[in-house]
């Protein structure tokens, strides 16, 4: 324990480490503020003027509007919202045109527009997948079989995307059949808020890798651990202590940073909107049976696992290489490889088996949850979020073991 405390103290005494930790905490606040600042809406006044609201004022105004549409997403409520929408369009013209009265839009369209979000999808063309125009949908077609209609659309999508893999199609339909219906809606929080959670996790991963790179390689360069390595517990025990100290620092930093980040978001957008079903924020045919509050927890857990798996890879490289710069460069390449692989080739094994597969931009864990990517091998199909988590879990232990093994076998030049 004393050796552990000394190692932790040694890490924290580094000016570079302290600077990176401060940056991590500052980014937590700054990146939570950004999606809040993006919020905006025009509020019509009684005298005919318009007030532009931004930030917290816009969020508060929207919350008051959305209260009327909060509740279970039943076919009757969707039908009523569609009838109101179509009535307004027939009377005032398309909602997107400038001539549409702002007061009517705020009063009759905004409160219920998220109820209609999945309607175009549910009635999409089965061949092309193009969503139906809301004006072309007969309200009488929205009956008790609305959720069956959604399942039919998922079947069409999976048939188009996984045409040669019936196992993937069947697994997606089985997973969708397990969803709790009717869905629940309490609008408020934006997609940007969740995107910035993932972006913050990416920056945290970069900062943690930058700190971890010198764990062993830095000592090789300076010879700082030469004497300790000759003692009874100077190899395996020292390696384990260094790794535990590094992991402790990264776990605490991650949890503090992400907690501050999410608390700021939830304080701004409110917690009622976290009861909203995942399908009502992204796609009506999404597979996860979770709400937005559970989504936050899942993103944090998956993010922490991916960060630790990536750091364990960096620690292995640090134990293997002789200088910090080489470790840092290779680690950054490993960290960003899934992102580049996904952009170049889409969802493949290469983009999902790296320790950092759940971290990034288009390839991040959030987007994998919202997508329908299945990887196929033989007659089996695997949903990419499951592959990402399993790979990261295995690699965390494998790279940690290899780091210890490499450090024990290291020979001082």
Model-derived segments and spans:
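Transmembrane helix segments
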Residues: 33-34, 324-357
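Short hydrophobic, aromatic-rich alpha-helical segments embedded in or entering the lipid bilayer
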Residues: 349-373
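Aromatic- and glycine-rich beta-strand/loop motifs that create alpha-glucan
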Residues: 1-18
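Residue-level recognition of transmembrane alpha-helices
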Residues: 21-24, 242, 331
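Alpha-helical transmembrane segments of multi-pass membrane transporters/translocases
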Residues: 17, 306-314, 371-413
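Cytoplasmic juxtamembrane regions at transmembrane-helix boundaries
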Residues: 222, 230, 314-335, 408-413
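Short helix-to-coil transition segments within interhelical loops
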Residues: 229-235
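Secretory targeting signals
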Residues: 26-89, 138-219, 240-320, 364, ...
């Amino acid at each position: 324990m004393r050796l552990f405390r000394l190692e932790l103290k040694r890490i924290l005494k580094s000016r570079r480490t302290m600077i990176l930790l401060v940056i991590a905490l500052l980014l937590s606040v700054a990146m939570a503020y950004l999606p809040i600042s993006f919020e905006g809406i025009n509020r019509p006044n009684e005298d005919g003027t318009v007030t532009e609201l931004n930030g917290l004022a816009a969020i508060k105004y929207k919350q008051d509007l959305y209260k009327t549409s909060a509740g279970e997403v039943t076919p009757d409520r969707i039908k009523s919202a569609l009838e109101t929408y179509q009535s307004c369009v027939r009377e005032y013209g398309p909602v997107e045109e400038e001539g549409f009265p702002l007061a009517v839009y705020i009063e009759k369209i905004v409160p219920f527009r998220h109820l209609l979000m999945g309607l175009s999808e549910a009635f999409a063309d089965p061949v092309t997948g193009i969503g139906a125009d809301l004006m072309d949908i007969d309200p009488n077609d929205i009956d008790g079989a609305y959720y069956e209609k959604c399942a039919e659309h998922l079947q069409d999508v999976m048939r188009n995307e996984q045409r040669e893999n019936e196992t993937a199609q069947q697994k997606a339909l089985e997973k969708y059949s397990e969803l709790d219906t009717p869905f629940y809606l309490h609008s408020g929080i934006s997609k940007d808020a969740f995107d910035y959670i993932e972006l913050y996790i990416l920056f945290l991963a970069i900062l943690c890798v930058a700190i971890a790179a010198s764990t062993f390689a830095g000592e090789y360069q300076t010879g700082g651990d030469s004497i300790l390595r000759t003692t009874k517990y100077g190899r395996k025990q020292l390696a384990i202590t260094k790794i535990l100290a590094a992991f402790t620092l990264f776990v605490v930093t991650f949890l503090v940073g992400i907690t501050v980040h999410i608390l700021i978001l939830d304080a701004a957008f409110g917690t009622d909107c976290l009861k909203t079903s995942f399908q009502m924020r992204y796609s009506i045919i999404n597979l996860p049976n979770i709400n937005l509050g559970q989504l936050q927890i899942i993103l944090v857990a998956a993010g922490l696992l991916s960060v630790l798996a990536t750091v364990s890879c960096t620690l292995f490289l640090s134990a293997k290489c002789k200088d910090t710069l080489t470790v840092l460069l290779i680690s950054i390449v490993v960290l960003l490889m899934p992102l580049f692989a996904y952009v170049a080739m889409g969802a493949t094994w290469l983009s999902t088996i790296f320790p950092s597969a759940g971290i990034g931009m288009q390839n991040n864990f959030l987007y994998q949850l919202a997508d329908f990517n299945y990887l196929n091998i033989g007659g089996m199909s695997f949903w990419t979020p499951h592959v990402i988590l399993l790979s990261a879990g295995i690699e965390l232990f494998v790279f940690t073991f290899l780091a210890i093994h490499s450090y024990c076998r290291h020979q001082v030049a």
